[in-house]
Every structure is written in structure tokens, then in C-alpha cells.
């Protein structure tokens, strides 16, 4: 099972992380890259990286995850969200809308109101909420509440979604 090997390649123990926010999703309309780019203008104190702008090897991508504090999602379509799990594996945090598979997979601390990114108008109408959430999470990254949530969410996803243990047991 491919996800079970991530722990061999992504390390969560990098002590100092940089103020980097990643967009590791493909460039597709339902991923709303335009919102990410607009947030970059609104919050220039952070380094915003669209991973598609670079020809990263898997090793380079994993190192970037380990260096970064956040993966941002404004997705309108998602079934699993591997990159949001990868940032947890790297000791960082996802920031996801409270919709789609994110509702059941991610702890509330990592969610923002869905209305903030339902569409461009929703973003324009509610961007102060989203900007405030990003600033709060980035500024308090080392707070016990966030660090504990990273660890517990990583463990729950590993046990519930990113393991083939139940499949192996069924096959025996």
C-alpha cells in the first residue's frame, strides 16, 4: 500500500520550519489556484509556493514539505487529499475548507468555513476570515494546541485512511 511507505521518506522531526505555505495540488479549476495567488498578495510576510511552478523530484518535494508550515487547500473536489496528509507526515499543518472529505478527515483546528472559498465571490466576501485563520495558524504554529493536533490527526489518518491493514486481514 503506497501510503504506508511515506514514513520512510517524509520526516516530521525537523525542529525549525520556515514560514512557507504550499499549494501542492494540480493546476485545475476545482483547486482554485487563483485564491492561493490572491492570498499571496494579501499576506506577503509568508513565502507562497505553487509546487507546479517547479520541476521537483519526489525527494525535493518531500524536503519542501519538511521545511514548510502549511499546505493550503481551497478545493471544490476532493476524495482523499494526499498532500494534506503529507504535510502532517512532515510535521506541518493543512488548512482546508470545511467540506468534502476534509470534514471527516481533518480536525477542526485545521478547517476554515467553507463559504470562504466556495467561489471567487465567496472569497471576496469572506477573505478577512480566511486571512485571519492563516495568520493565527502560522503565528501560533509552535503552540501545544497546534502541535498536538498535528500529531493526533496524523495518527488518526494513518490508522483510518492510509493503511491497508484491514485489507490484509480480510485477505487472510
Regions found by a protein language model. Give the residues of each.
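Aromatic "clamp/platform" in nucleotide-sugar-dependent glycosyltransferases that forms part
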Residues: 75-76
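Short hydrophobic beta-strand element within catalytic cores of glycosyltransferases
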Residues: 93-96
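Short alpha-helical donor nucleotide-sugar binding micro-motif in glycosyltransferases
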Residues: 62-68
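A charged, aromatic-enriched C-terminal amphipathic alpha-helix characteristic of glycosyltransferases
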Residues: 117-172
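Short acidic/histidine- and often glycine-rich active-site loop of Leloir-type glycosyltransferases
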Residues: 98-114
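Conserved catalytic-core segment of nucleotide-activated headgroup transferases in glycan assembly
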Residues: 3-58
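Short alpha-helical segment that forms part of, or immediately flanks, the ligand-binding pocket
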Residues: 62, 85-89, 100-104
Amino acid at each position: 500500500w503506497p501510503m504506508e511507505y511515506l514514513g520512510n521518506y517524509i520526516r516530521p522531526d525537523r525542529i525549525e520550519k520556515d514560514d512557507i505555505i504550499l499549494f501542492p495540488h494540480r493546476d485545475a479549476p476545482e483547486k482554485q489556484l487563483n485564491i492561493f495567488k490572491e492570498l499571496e498578495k494579501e499576506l506577503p510576510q509568508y513565502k507562497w509556493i505553487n509546487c507546479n511552478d517547479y520541476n521537483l523530484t519526489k525527494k525535493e518535494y518531500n524536503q519542501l514539505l519538511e521545511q514548510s508550515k502549511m499546505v493550503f487547500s481551497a478545493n471544490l473536489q476532493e476524495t482523499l487529499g494526499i498532500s494534506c496528509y503529507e504535510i502532517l507526515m512532515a510535521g506541518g499543518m493543512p488548512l482546508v475548507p470545511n467540506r468534502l472529505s476534509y470534514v471527516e478527515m481533518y480536525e477542526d483546528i485545521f478547517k476554515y468555513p467553507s463559504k470562504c472559498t466556495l467561489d471567487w465571490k465567496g472569497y471576496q466576501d469572506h477573505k478577512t476570515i480566511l486571512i485571519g485563520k492563516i495568520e493565527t495558524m502560522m503565528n501560533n504554529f509552535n503552540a501545544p494546541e497546534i502541535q498536538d493536533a498535528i500529531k493526533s490527526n496524523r495518527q488518526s489518518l494513518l490508522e483510518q485512511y492510509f493503511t491497508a491493514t484491514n485489507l490484509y486481514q480480510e485477505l487472510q
